[in-house]
Regions:
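Amphipathic alpha-helical segments used for helix-helix packing
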Residues: 88-115
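Alpha-helical DNA-contacting segments of helix-turn-helix folds
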Residues: 52, 59-66
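Basic, helix-initiating cap at the start of DNA-binding domains
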Residues: 1-27, 34-43, 56-57
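Key DNA-contact positions within bacterial/archaeal DNA-binding proteins
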Residues: 46
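Hydrophobic alpha-helical connector segments
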Residues: 61, 68-95, 144-151, 170
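Amphipathic, non-transmembrane alpha-helical scaffold segments
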Residues: 9, 17, 63, 67, ...
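Hydrophobic/aromatic-rich alpha-helical bundle segments in the mid-to-C-terminal region
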Residues: 111-115, 119, 133-180, 184
């Protein structure tokens, strides 16, 4: 049997994840049957589950990919870049984002599983804010955990607004965010 290149394997994995995102977005986790995944991805269940052992692993892979993407944006473009990126996300991305949030609410073990799969993501975010604080960019009269919660609340609210078709004034929102977190 010929050896398959790493590029081919990565392209096939990306194809599966993209099709899975569309399926989860359209039908939710429960409604994303294996048959629907096969139809949307254009591959057999054997091909799909050769890359991911089950539907749950496929869903978690999407969540981990999104978490990595968020961290890359946060590290390279900062909080402004992250919030701007949220306003540009596809409807399918937003639908999966909220499906994950719904599942986090009903399945507390999911957060532990996500942290176990990607322990460096939370640490990298904390380190970034610590660095910003040391550089005098983030206020020091409020604990970092509160700042993280604040930014997450803004990001989640912005994602919800965009997903229902609202177009918030992002520059005004960013000004409010910075009023709340920037060093005085």
């Amino acid at each position: 049997m010929p050896k398959v290149s790493e590029e081919h394997l990565q392209a096939r994995r990306a194809q599966i994840l993209e099709g899975a995102r569309r399926t989860f977005a359209a039908h939710g986790y429960e409604g994303a049957t294996v048959r629907r995944l096969e139809d949307e991805i254009g591959l057999s269940r054997g091909a799909i589950f050769n890359y991911f052992p089950d539907k749950w692993s496929l869903f978690l892979a999407l969540a981990a990919e999104d978490q990595h993407g968020f961290m890359r944006v946060l590290e390279t473009e900062g909080i402004d870049g992250l919030l701007r990126r949220l306003t540009q996300e596809s409807p399918d991305w937003l639908a999966v984002y909220f499906e994950l949030a719904r599942r986090l609410r009903t399945n507390p073990e999911l957060m532990e599983e996500l942290q176990r799969r990607n322990p460096e993501a939370s640490r990298r975010g904390d380190e970034l804010l610590e660095t910003m604080r040391r550089e005098g960019k983030v206020r020091d009269d409020v604990d970092l955990e509160s700042i993280i919660v604040f930014v997450n609340l803004i990001a989640n609210g912005l994602a919800l607004a965009v997903s229902i078709g609202l177009q918030p004034d992002l520059d005004a929102l960013l000004q409010l965010v910075h009023t709340g977190i920037d060093a005085q």
